[in-house]
């Protein structure tokens, strides 16, 4: 018997997106009546449950700060030592592969998450907050209301095979890949990114360090913190393999491929087939795993998809994977949960105040789908072909991270997601379009140039522009300051793209005469093929030329061996931060950061890392 059948908000789906939305609503709008419906009953299995086990900075900010769960994550889940990549040379020892990854835990935290543990705990949390949970219940229908009437949700309680109906002013689709409303309303779209995956879990610790030869002591000791705590990626042309530690003590392993290069039917039909694929493509990892028994095995073909609309002024929304999904690379899934949940809360807030307009919702859809989603889509579409090129993927990783921190993260934490302005939207379109141009450059570069090693172990803490953007994750500025910095950073991304373009030309067309001049170009129109330069309009620059030394220095040891100056200037600060197992980083920097930067405008900090020019 269902005691209560009408709610202010009914959330269809009790996974990570639905449960976090329920908590978010209860914290922000405590007067609401909220129900969550999910087909699964507790207890949910730990470890062998769902993927999406790794977070990055924006998702962590949402989970830890907005939802006030930071103490919980610190206690029950694992700290994340950033993203680590072993690129190319997949037939050899892992310790001899080009590597990019951090040696010390970053100042702004992120976590390795056991999804079963988290979702069990979140159900307990929201239930204690007086959220009504309908567990073991299937959503069979959603009838959207006309005008100001209530929505109707048809449900089936599985154990009793009993049908019942709920009504709500707001209905939220958090049913994940079932994409109930997207299917019903004809809103599904192709993402243009065709990739597939298979994954499984092992009991116990699978440490990437142990994949190396036993005598590789110097390589093991080259990272202050244990590589085990990173999201480890073993990559080559068309694929990557993940190793993720879980707080329950298990380890998640997955294969992810470009479907056009490594079809899912070559590895995704069974665990034994997946291991055979690893034996062929990642023999060192296969040799380490070959005698271990998996806890589970799952596979998904063409997992990526897009949407025409996820928010409606008619009082519905699609959050998390019920709207769109791009790729597990970079762990952006929780970022999109954060953005779609936060917009949903804002729409409900405005609706209760009688202030929600159709124009508001159109703007939210534009920001989330046309700008943030499409910018992130550029990171992945056709990009897997560069994964065996260490000299290309390392700057790509830096670029992708910088774009995400400089625009998407700042839009969220500085309040522009819920209160977007025309100027911030216009800047977002410029960031998106420049990103598309640079991503195409990476693709064309990888098709033309052979893979080669980088000259140092890549570590983004060596790159001053990324150091600055990482510090600025913690600042809080007024609207005008945020816009000013976004314009200045776009100026730097333009300069960074100039450096990347001429490096690509140097590697792909070393005899080209323009290398002697290296003129300033329009990076929004650049094309790598010299035969297309004249028609592209890329020599009609829209921005003012300026020195490129600062941007070029971000790639010291990547494009060419380090010279004496590089070793003195850039390695010195790196070595100071890593002295005595990171003593300065862990003890001195956090105190200064909290006193001088945390939740402050800290405009002065930019002068320590970069020279800002007047944006065009």
In which residue ranges do the predicted regions lie?
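Conserved Rossmann-like nucleotide-cofactor binding loop
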Residues: 17, 21, 42
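Short beta-strand to alpha-helix junction loop
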Residues: 104-124, 263-269
């Amino acid at each position: 018997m269902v005691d209560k059948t009408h709610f202010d908000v009914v959330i269809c789906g009790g996974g990570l997106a639905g449960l976090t939305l329920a908590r978010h609503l209860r914290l922000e709008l405590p007067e609401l009546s909220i129900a969550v419906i999910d087909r699964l009953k507790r207890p949910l299995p730990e470890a062998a449950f769902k993927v999406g086990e790794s977070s990055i900075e924006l998702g962590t900010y949402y989970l830890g700060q907005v939802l006030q769960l930071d103490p919980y994550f610190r206690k029950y889940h694992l700290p994340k030592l950033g993203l680590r990549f072993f690129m190319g040379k997949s037939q050899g020892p892992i310790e001899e592969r080009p590597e990019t990854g951090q040696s010390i835990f970053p100042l702004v935290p992120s976590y390795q998450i056991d999804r079963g543990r988290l979702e069990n705990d979140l159900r307990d949390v929201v239930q204690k907050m007086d959220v009504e949970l309908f567990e073991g219940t299937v959503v069979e229908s959603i009838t959207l209301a006309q005008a100001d009437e209530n929505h109707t949700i048809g449900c089936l309680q599985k154990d009793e095979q009993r049908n019942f109906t709920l009504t709500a002013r707001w209905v939220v689709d958090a049913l994940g890949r079932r994409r109930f409303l997207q299917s019903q309303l004809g809103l599904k779209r192709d993402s243009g990114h065709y990739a597939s995956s298979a994954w499984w879990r092992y009991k116990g610790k699978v440490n990437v360090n142990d994949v190396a030869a036993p005598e590789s002591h110097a390589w093991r000791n080259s990272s202050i913190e244990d590589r085990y705590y990173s999201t480890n990626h073993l990559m080559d042309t068309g694929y990557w393999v993940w190793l993720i530690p879980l707080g329950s003590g298990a380890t998640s392993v997955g294969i992810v491929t470009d479907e056009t290069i490594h079809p899912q039917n070559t590895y995704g039909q069974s665990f034994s087939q997946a291991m055979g694929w690893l034996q062929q493509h990642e023999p060192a990892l296969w040799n380490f795993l070959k005698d271990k028994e998996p806890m589970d095995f799952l596979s998904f073909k063409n997992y990526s998809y897009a949407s025409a609309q996820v928010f409606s002024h008619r009082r519905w929304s699609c959050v998390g994977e019920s709207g769109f999904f791009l790729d597990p690379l970079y762990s952006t899934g929780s970022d999109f949960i954060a953005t779609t949940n936060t917009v949903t809360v804002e729409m409900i807030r405005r609706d209760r105040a009688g202030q929600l307009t159709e124009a508001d919702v159109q703007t939210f859809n534009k920001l989330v789908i046309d700008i943030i989603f499409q910018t992130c889509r550029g990171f992945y579409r056709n990009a897997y072909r560069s994964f065996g090129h260490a000299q290309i993927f390392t700057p790509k990783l830096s670029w992708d991270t910088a774009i995400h921190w400089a625009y998407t993260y700042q839009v969220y934490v500085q309040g522009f997601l819920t209160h977007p302005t025309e100027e911030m939207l216009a800047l977002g379109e410029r960031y998106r379009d420049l990103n598309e141009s640079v991503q195409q450059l990476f693709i064309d570069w990888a098709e033309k140039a052979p893979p080669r090693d980088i000259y140092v172990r890549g570590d983004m803490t060596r790159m001053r522009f990324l150091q600055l953007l990482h510090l600025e994750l913690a600042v809080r500025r007024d609207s005008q300051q945020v816009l000013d910095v976004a314009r200045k950073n776009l100026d730097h991304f333009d300069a960074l793209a100039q450096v990347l373009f001429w490096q690509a030309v140097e590697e792909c067309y070393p005899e080209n005469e323009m290398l002697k001049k290296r003129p300033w170009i329009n990076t929004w129109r650049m094309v790598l093929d010299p035969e297309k330069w004249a028609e592209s309009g890329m020599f009609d620059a829209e921005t003012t030329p300026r020195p490129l030394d600062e941007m070029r220095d971000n790639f010291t040891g990547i494009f060419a061996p380090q010279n004496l100056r590089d070793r003195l200037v850039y390695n010195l600060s790196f070595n100071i931060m890593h002295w005595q197992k990171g003593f300065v980083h862990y003890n001195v920097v956090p105190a200064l950061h909290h006193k001088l930067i945390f939740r402050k405008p800290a405009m002065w900090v930019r002068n320590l890392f970069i020279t800002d020019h007047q944006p065009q």
